[in-house]
Amino acid sequence: MWAPERSAEEQGNLTRSLGSSEDCGSVSVVFPMTMLITGFVGNALAMLLVSQSYRRRESKRKKSFLLCIGWLALTDMVGQLLTSPVVIVLYLSHQRWEQLDPSGRLCTFFGLTMTAFGLSSLFIASAMAVERALAIRAPHWYSSHMKTSATRAVLLGVWLAVLAFALLPVLGVGQYTIQWPGTWCFISTRTGGNETSSENNWGNIFFASAFSFLGLSALVVTFACNLATIKALVSRCRAKATASQSSAQWGRITTETAIQLMGIMCVLSVCWSPLLIMMLKTIFNQTSVEYCKVYTEKQNECNFFLIAVRLASLNQILDPWVYLLLRKILLQKFCQAVSQKQREEAATLIFTHLSISRTEPGEARVLFSKSKC
């Protein structure tokens, strides 16, 4: 049940296609090792910051959002810990995947893990976008209905639904197969074959298409909700333009939030769109990237597919920085810049007063003490 079925011709082609994957082992192993280390550090740091903020009383209104960030960081970190070590061991051992995994069960587990954790990240990002949009556009409904228990239920529901979808190949709908250059497994996009395998081919088409459409749908929901949030923030900022201090504060908040949301949309689109669109393209064109070493004319397509998968994996590293860590760093830099500017303005003002009215030194200390960020 766990082992993907292959014909004799397919097995021979696959063996030839993966034979040269050992040649790039010493070079390519740097990529998964770097991703594992950076991803683990970033997500662990994000989880630490979330746990500290979650315990504070003043963050009660942010608990739903903090739960989503913590769940996303945990999802990304566990996904990397389950997949990256397998790739590293395969590169360092200079073995083909079939030598390391003759039964094919590890391949199925690897593909299931990539599918489940990849879709989970996308859907959690969508849930966070919906949560932000509701908090900004419907604050009264949000405060009365959006409890932490509801957030936990939604996150758990996302996880269970994605896991059920990823288990479809185990039940016979779709396949997880070895992908070029033979160091990882993922959803099969193979659509050709003889009549005996037509049922498997239709299963491959359905499963791969469903994965792509689900991923693209999650991206669309995230984009729509983030744009709605930005629009609502800009409208509220204009409405508060009557009071200068309130207007300046809301302008700063709107700018920071808009930059962060646009950064999230850019990262998601760059990391996931190439893989999802290319999977649909290979299905509609009835092509496959599983036998790259056999058909040399597909070499460019195979290289692009590998880059697309690496970009999707890179999203697990960028998530904690885009959602939490980078925002904290930018806020600290902003505070330092404002504080420095206030000190310079205070020093200029003090120098002017001293030169004109010979102000007592005690007043300078008072002005400096009020110029803190």
Swiss-Prot record:
Biased composition (Polar residues): 10-20
Alphabetical list of InterPro entries matching this protein: EP3_rcpt_2, GPCR_Rhodpsn, GPCR_Rhodpsn_7TM, Prostanoid_rcpt, Prostglndn_DP_rcpt, Prostglndn_EP3_rcpt
Keyword set includes Glycoprotein: yes
Residues in compartment: Cytoplasmic: 56-68, 131-152, 231-260, 327-373
Principal place of residence: membrane
Membrane found in the keyword field: yes
Keywords recorded for this protein, A-Z: Cell membrane, Disulfide bond, G-protein coupled receptor, Glycoprotein, Membrane, Receptor, Transducer, Transmembrane, Transmembrane helix
Entry-linked Pfam families: 7tm_1 (PF00001)
Glycosylated position list: N13, N194
Disulphide-bridged cysteine pairs: C107-C185
GO cellular component: plasma membrane
Membrane topology, from the record: Multi-pass membrane protein
Annotated localization: Cell membrane
Residue ranges crossing the lipid bilayer per the database entry: 31-55, 69-89, 109-130, 153-174, 205-230, 261-284, 305-326
Ranges for region Disordered: 1-23
PANTHER family per the UniProt record, alphabetical: G-PROTEIN COUPLED RECEPTOR FAMILY 1 MEMBER, PROSTAGLANDIN E2 RECEPTOR EP3 SUBTYPE
Subunit structure: Interacts (via C-terminus) with MKLN1.
Sequence similarity: Belongs to the G-protein coupled receptor 1 family.
Job of this protein: Receptor for prostaglandin E2 (PGE2). Required for normal development of fever in response to pyrinogens, including IL1B, prostaglandin E2 and bacterial lipopolysaccharide (LPS). Required for normal potentiation of platelet aggregation by prostaglandin E2, and thus plays a role in the regulation of blood coagulation. Required for increased HCO3(-) secretion in the duodenum in response to mucosal acidification, and thereby contributes to the protection of the mucosa against acid-induced ulceration. Not required for normal kidney function, normal urine volume and osmolality.
Name recorded for this polypeptide: Prostaglandin E2 receptor EP3 subtype
Native organism: Sus scrofa (Pig)
Higher taxonomy: Eukaryota, Metazoa, Chordata, Craniata, Vertebrata
